[in-house]
Design a protein with these regions (language model features):
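Short, structured beta-strand/loop micro-motifs enriched in basic residues and often containing a Trp
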Residues: 12-20
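Intrinsically disordered, low-complexity Pro/Gly/Ser/Thr-rich segments with frequent PxxP/GP/PP motifs
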Residues: 20-43
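Terminal connector regions
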Residues: 40-87, 93-96
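Asparagine-centered strand-capping/turn motif at beta-strand->loop junctions
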Residues: 2-12, 62
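Short loop/turn positions at the edges of beta-strands in beta-sheet-rich folds
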Residues: 10-12, 31, 52-54
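Short secondary-structure capping micro-motifs at structural edges
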Residues: 3-5, 21-24, 48
Length: 96
């Protein structure tokens, strides 16, 4: 396994949502924020698959050993931000 890092930057003028599966974890990124995932990916083949749901949501499927995955937002630990949405009503999933 190779230690791998993948980052996503929100360059939009509104929040975006990134789900990391299989767990699931989901992060709301404010404009300008960067989410970085760090995990043990396979030495060969795809390290990650990314599915775009729409222009504000994507789903990330890391391959390899992701049990000890690190989640960083702007280079700071961010696991506590998973499912902590400011702009989305958790009951309906609609943006506020």
């Amino acid at each position: 396994m190779a230690r791998t890092q993948q980052s996503f930057v929100n360059r939009k003028d509104k929040p975006i949502y990134i789900s990391v599966e299989m767990w699931p974890e989901c992060f709301e990124l404010e404009p300008g924020e960067k989410l970085t995932l760090i995990w043990d990916a396979p030495d060969q083949g795809e390290a990650v698959q990314i599915d775009f749901v729409n222009d504000l949501e994507l789903v990330v499927w890391p391959n390899g050993n992701a049990e000890d995955m690190q989640f960083l937002i702007d280079d700071k630990p961010a696991r506590s931000r998973s499912w902590a949405f400011k702009h989305c009503d958790p009951a309906t999933g609609n943006l506020r």
